[in-house]
Amino acid sequence: MLSGRLAVIIPIFKKGAKDDPANYRPVSLTSVPCKVMESLVKDSLNAFLATKGSISVHQHGFMKGRSCLTNLLESLEKWTQALDEGFGVDVLYLDYRKAFDSVPHKRLLEKLKTYGIHGRLLRWIQSFLEARLMRVGIRGSFSDWIKILSGVPQGSVLGPLLFLLFVNDLPDWIKNSIRLFADDAKIWNVIRSDADNHSLQEDLNSLSKWSDKWLMRLNSDKCKVMHVGHSPCAAYSLKDEAGNRVTIKQIKVS
């Protein structure tokens, strides 16, 4: 299993300034035998979870028959109905900083137990996650090996499913409408009165509590609120990484 714990990280450029490391996505290259084992474990997990109906219906990332398009269409239908009735909609777009890399292993394993995953399968997943080593490779040059203390490996076969299970209970903390695409969360409410704005702010507060409990960090700079309609948009706030309350940046769409 040692070879399965070794990964070469290749930085894949996303967008923005190329000299900013934050603008690169780390992708893990692992051994072929490890990927084969991951595929077998993933198939077993999916078959088991399908019998339980465990994955939230609000999750559209890495799910068969669901996609960015299904996520968008479900939302647009509700928003259009609200506009036809003469109401606006406030939509919160929430971003987690280095979400896949931040997943704490012990807490993930505890969550897996709540879904009925025990015994040898759980021990294999624990072995897969813990005592991993990585080094970064760029144009044939490599860094030294370092130990990975948290996260599910991006670019791996099993990593996305483990991440979905980790965030699977997030919708349970939210009163209003929510859709997820892996680590991207979208929460909205039809605004008929000030009480609806207040309810959406309460969801933000609940999301902050979930994040604190599970050691995930909201990226306040990338969180946005979009108001659909002609009425004024309310101000919403959340805690930044320093614990200070900051107002979420607004995008207005008429």
Can you say where each PLM-predicted feature lies in the sequence?
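Conserved pre-catalytic core of RNA-dependent polymerases
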Residues: 1-153, 189
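Active-site palm subdomain of RNA-directed nucleic acid polymerases
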Residues: 41-59, 160-189
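Short, conserved phosphate/pyrophosphate- and ester-handling motifs at nucleotide-, phospho-/glycolipid
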Residues: 155, 159
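Short, conserved micro-motifs composed of acidic
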Residues: 140, 202, 217-252
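Short, charged alpha-helical motifs in flexible N/C-terminal segments and linkers
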Residues: 9, 20, 80-91, 208-227, ...
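Non-catalytic, peripheral interaction segments enriched in hydrophobic/basic residues
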Residues: 63, 181-184, 189, 209-235
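Catalytic palm subdomain of template-directed nucleic-acid polymerases
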Residues: 99-115, 185-212
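Hydrophobic alpha-helical membrane-association signature
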Residues: 75, 162-166, 200-203
